[in-house]
A protein has these predicted regions:
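Active-site catalytic loop in hydrolytic enzyme cores
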Residues: 1-39, 47-48, 52-62, 124-128
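Conserved acidic residues
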Residues: 42
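Short secondary-structure boundary segments
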Residues: 48-49, 74-76
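C-terminal beta-strand edge segments of enzyme domains
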Residues: 11, 76-146
Length: 146
């Protein structure tokens, strides 16, 4: 059912948007969201086979806010073997507002309008900026830890 991928953290241009891609369990790791945001992603697409009820759906808005990106989490529904997938797909804006929340066990399609400038504006306040205020030297230790 599940195995790690080897495609890295891709971003690609589609019309005037930069789209990043995370898959399933990737959502759990804050670093990958930040990398995609730093690569210029306006929207992060997150296809998933989530099986822990509500956990990702609670965390996804946090990742949207802390990276100022739109997130589209498309989660599977139904059961296969012993696994039941939790549905509840989400579209979240760059300020963490849930724009669409699908049901847990029913196929759902939604269309929302987004303003890409909301993702491109990384100012938190007139004094605070998500990228300019980063201190990468403080996280160097993280890279050397097992």
């Amino acid at each position: 059912y599940f195995c790690p991928g080897d495609n890295g953290l891709p971003v690609f241009q589609r019309q005037n948007a930069v789209i990043g891609l995370l898959v399933c369990y990737d959502w759990f790791f804050a670093e990958v969201w930040k990398i995609l945001a730093l690569k210029g992603a306006d929207i992060i697409c997150h296809p998933s086979n989530l099986i822990l009820p509500g956990l990702a759906q609670q965390g996804i808005p946090f990742h949207a806010v802390t990276n100022r990106v739109f997130i589209v989490t498309a989660n599977r529904i139904g059961t296969e073997g012993s696994l039941t997938f939790t549905g509840n797909s989400l579209i979240v804006d760059a300020r963490g507002e849930v724009l669409s929340h699908a049901p847990a066990a029913k196929a759902h399609v939604d269309v929302v309008s987004i303003d890409l400038e909301r993702a491109r504006d990384k100012a938190v306040t007139f004094r605070n900026h998500l990228f300019e205020d980063r201190r990468p030297q403080d996280y160097e230790e993280l890279l050397s830890m097992p």
